[in-house]
Swiss-Prot record:
Keywords: Phosphoprotein, Ribonucleoprotein, Ribosomal protein. CDD domains: Ribosomal_L7_archeal_euk. It comes from Homo sapiens (Human). The gene is RPL7L1. It comes from the Eukaryota. This is Ribosomal protein uL30-like.
Length: 255
């Protein structure tokens, strides 16, 4: 009885034994793994070199001439603004402006670059809401050849925020889909939901700056043919500068 049990156990152990892999197959598998590791390393190095190469951009002589011309033009224009400001009068019925950057700023003066940065328009075809004040109007005059701006209505404000509204929370960009996030960051200003946020932007109050800075700049949609036919696309958009209430048409076009 004992011998039969022992025999059965030995048979089961033999069945459970892991089958041995032939030595030549192990060598092939090891060589294949080494080859894959080498290929992965080479691909990583090539990717790093490609990233390094992207930083090296050679400028043509025409680009330097164009940048020099832009800087001279900016200097003359800004000097004229200092001598004869011709500031726009503050409108009685409008307290909110929407500014869209529609031109590249390569080679422009440092003052223009700094003003663009203050307006948070670092990317082309991005837009921000700005409260209409003498100081902000002066900033808009400085960057006038590179942006277009006007007075949005409540419908445009609502559509922009509902479709493209985003906020930066803990260095992460998140869509405005949760009222809890809005209440957590803007509740101290009496803003607890998306409708409150839209109202505070459309009708600027004393906390407009804090609320508008909670919003990320709006990255507007550009037609597919814009990259191929930039001149034609800019003609469709219109010229830079002030356009009053016609900014609502542009918002609907790019939203």
């Amino acid at each position: 009885m004992i011998s039969s049990c022992t025999t059965r156990k030995m048979a089961e152990q033999e069945q459970r034994k892991i089958p041995l892999v032939p030595e030549n197959l192990l060598k092939k598998r090891k060589a294949y793994q080494a080859l894959k590791a080498t290929q992965a390393k080479q691909a990583l190095l090539a990717k790093k070199e490609q990233k390094k190469g992207k930083g090296l951009r050679f400028k043509r002589l025409e680009s330097f001439l164009h940048d020099s011309w832009r800087q001279k033009r900016d200097k003359v224009r800004l000097r004229r603004l200092e001598v004869k400001p011709h500031a726009l009068e503050l409108p009685d019925k409008h307290s909110l402006a929407f500014v869209v950057r529609i031109e590249r700023i390569d080679g422009v003066s440092l003052l223009v670059q700094r003003t663009i940065a203050r307006l948070r328009l670092k990317k082309i075809f991005s837009g921000v809401f700005v409260k209409v004040t003498p100081q902000n109007l002066k900033m808009l005059r400085i960057v006038e050849p590179y942006v277009t701006w006007g007075f949005p209505n409540l419908k445009s404000v609502r559509e922009l925020i509902l479709k493209r509204g985003q906020a930066k929370v803990k260095n992460k960009t998140i869509p405005l889909t949760d009222n809890t996030v809005i209440e957590e960051h803007l509740g101290k200003f009496g803003v607890i939901c998306l409708e409150d946020l839209i109202h505070e932007i459309a009708f600027p109050g004393k906390h407009f700056q804090e609320i508008s800075w909670f919003l990320c700049p709006f990255h507007l949609s550009v037609a597919r043919h814009a990259t191929k036919n930039r001149v034609g696309f800019l003609k469709e958009m219109g010229t830079p500068g002030y356009r009053g209430e016609r900014i609502n048409q542009l918002i609907r076009q790019l939203n």
